[in-house]
Amino acid sequence: LPTTWRPGPPLGCSAGNRMMQSPPITQEITVEEMERYKQATAEMCANLQVCGFDSLLFHFGHSIPVAQFLSPLTDRRTDQYGGSTENRCRYLVEILDACREATRGRMTFEVRMSATEFAEGGIDLEEGIRIASILQDHCDIIQASCGMITEKYMTWTHPCQHMGYHPNLWLAEAFKKSGKIHKPVTAVGGLESLQAAEDAIAEGKCDFFAVARQLIADPETIKKAIDGRADDVVPCIKCMRCHDSTVYGHHFQCSVNPTAGLENSIAHLVQPVERVKK
């Protein structure tokens, strides 16, 4: 939640929550401040629509501040926004509805959420399915991520080399098999290959597979696939250099794509190869 509107501690769903990996420092946001944030978000969506965007991803997962409303571990409010699953979903539903109205229903909304936080007292898979079943009526796609951005639980949020490929696919599959989710479900995290995504979709485990790091490793991944050159795709090795390089204040870096983060500054130095790949 924004911290620039007022001095003092950052605002959170409840007092004493962590902001990502910070100490427990948040101050409980008031209903009036929640309304301001909701309207600002709706205005932002309308502006993005004017700029030409036709789809938006709402990040309601990983225990980032706004996502903390969903979890019984971090939502300790005693008003209409705390307690039951429905109450904990209420504010995010209001945000989605306000954004839908601001964009006149002409944008696709995808909601990213933690299907489970893996934390004791937090969202488990059963609760994640209940939350998704509520949010789905206010968006178009549900993305089944997991974990929390804290030292103990972010391993699943950003799966790295030692976890194997697409370790969180089972969560999207659980959503699909629950019989309670009627909107398309996106899987995310550590994709092995485009063929693996095709197989997961064909087997009914998910409807989409979201990628981010793969497009850093090879920005032409999708184009190569369309052109029938999937074997030429440079795979992401899940080393987390892209994540760590920015966290520690370096320019954006990738272990398998040396041009990542430097595209504009070194474009004039990259010359066509003299001999093309056979």
Question: Where do the PLM segments sit?
Answer:
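Flavin-dependent oxidoreductase catalytic cores
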Residues: 1-278
